[in-house]
Amino acid sequence: MNSIVNDLNRALAQHLLVNVYQTNQEVVYTGYVTTVSDTGIILATYDDYGIPDGAVFLDLTAIDEVEFSSDDLDNMAFRIQTAQDEQFVQAGGLTLQFDGHRDLKRQVLSHAWVDHLVLMLVLKDDEHFYEGIVTSVAAEQVSLQLLNKFDYTDQPLLTLTPKDIEVIEFQGQELTLQGIALPHLQKLSHVAPTTVTDADQFVPTLQQLVGKEPLVALVPKHNRELFFVGRINTVTADGVIMNLLDMTGQFGGYTLMRLSELHEIVLKSDYLQTMRLFALLNRARQQPIQPVLNDERLFDATVDQFGARISQAAAFRTIIRLKLHDGTDLLGFPSQVGGQRFIFHEIDDQQVDQVGQ
């Protein structure tokens, strides 16, 4: 433990970008240490795009390793610089100040209570993640009104002791947006999911949605726990192109899915209501899209879009992600496209920036 504390103090003193690995969770936090106490730390974190994404409190007992140097950190430093150079929308950075000589965990909970911040908690010996609003903070007890974006009927009051809390995420982009949206979310009523599962109805349903405002979710056969949320852009003879929304309600690129791989279309759900509200709030704040992206692309429904997208990616050396019939996930870029074959140059996330330069 002493070596971990020494590493954390070094990262704080030298303002080093670090990866913090946890003992009980696979989530790795990347960022700058802003406060170190005898029981925990505050880490100002960044998302995968290099954008400030709030902060996290980590109990010292939850920290397994502090990494100072790696390809992943070099990659993230490049992304952070790119986000600054391209003036990415940054609405979720750490703004709170903390005293390292006082109980950090209690400071975070008290700030959240006073400022009505949405938090994400991880508890000891509990694999669940809890999102909610702090409703009370006492010496040995904290109450949290849970929020469930997927089911508005499942939002109980959680009472726990502070010593059971290992991780607290706060002020991140998604959590901040949830806080802004909360008064509006509380006015929305629960809706039972409306879905289309009959494959014969997929094409007519999707064609009716082309170019329209309603958000839908597409659920693929290969992983029915995975789903894509967005608006239908184009329907071809064998595929559908969707303008995606990410978890913060911003434009998140495009996905092309074969109709034969589609398991279900979700037309109504509580989560779709939530994402629609997030998207509307982003528009009102003039933050619907990052400046380097283009959400106005049109695609020819009469063209084989699978071949067209692969040929274009090869021509411009664009990074794409492929999902094969057997569920294999590949990230990289194609070349030598011709006939029914092409060469795919697979890379990992740590290589993306070097390829993209």
Residue ranges of predicted features:
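Short glycine-rich, low-complexity segments
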Residues: M1-V28, D47-F129, N148-E225, D246-G327, ...
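Short beta-strand-centered aromatic/proline hotspots
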Residues: Y29-T35, H128-S136, L226-T234, D329-V337
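N-terminal beta-strand/beta-hairpin edge segment
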Residues: V33-T34, D38-I51, L244
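Short, conserved beta-turn/loop elements at beta-strand boundaries and strand-helix junctions
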Residues: V36-I41, F68-D71, V137-V142, F170-G172, ...
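Low-complexity, glycine/alanine/valine/leucine- and proline-rich hydrophobic stretches
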Residues: S335-Q336, R341-V352
